[in-house]
């Protein structure tokens, strides 16, 4: 992707990111947070298609149609995680677990091929961790490719295809979870696992 001929923005469009502090916009409702990126991108695509005369017959023709379609898709995603009733509330009224699930749904709204998670449970109360991990397990079981930075070793053991252990910005060990947890090779990995397992 570092080749100058590659349009990095096309790759970025197929990646979602979920951060440890949710990064929801507090001045927007839950549904507005979820709809914002799809509406923006689709409106740009609509303009471009109209200019080039390449608009598909079944594509939305106006911003209002794009918004209506994005709203229905966002509501479906909220239904999936049991938060449809929170569509029109502001993030400040949600629990940490609810905020993080909304952040995941916001990433899913762009229909990514890959989702990057940066410590998605670290800012949560212990009681809320399970609901976020359950959603992530569901995504993994559906075939979503995820790169997850986490200290949740049980989750990594259960869900990961590969585990990479990093220390001070360097990869010290990489292995399938069965091998990583049962037979770590690196001394620093062994030390870490002895403290957290």
Positions of PLM-derived features:
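ABC family nucleotide-binding domain
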Residues: 1-177
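C-terminal boundary and immediately downstream tail of ABC-type ATPase nucleotide-binding domains
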Residues: 174, 178-197
């Amino acid at each position: 992707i570092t080749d100058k001929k590659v349009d990095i923005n096309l790759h970025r469009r197929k990646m979602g990111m979920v951060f440890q502090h949710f990064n929801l916009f507090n001045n927007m409702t839950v549904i507005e947070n979820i709809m914002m990126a799809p509406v923006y991108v689709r409106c740009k695509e609509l303009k471009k298609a109209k200019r080039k005369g390449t608009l598909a017959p079944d594509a939305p023709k106006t911003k209002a149609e794009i918004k209506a379609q994005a709203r229905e898709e966002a509501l479906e995603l909220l239904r999936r995680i049991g938060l449809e009733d929170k569509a029109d509330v502001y993030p400040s009224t949600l629990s940490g677990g609810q905020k993080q699930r909304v952040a995941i749904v916001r990433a899913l709204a762009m229909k990514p091929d890959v989702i990057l998670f940066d410590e998605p449970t670290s800012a949560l109360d212990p009681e809320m961790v399970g609901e976020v991990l359950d959603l992530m397990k569901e995504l993994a079981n559906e075939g979503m490719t995820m790169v997850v930075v986490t200290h949740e070793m049980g989750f990594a053991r259960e869900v990961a295809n590969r585990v990479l252990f990093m220390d001070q910005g360097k990869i010290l060990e990489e292995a399938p979870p069965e091998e990583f947890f049962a037979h770590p090779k690196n001394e620093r990995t062994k030390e870490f696992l002895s403290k957290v397992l």
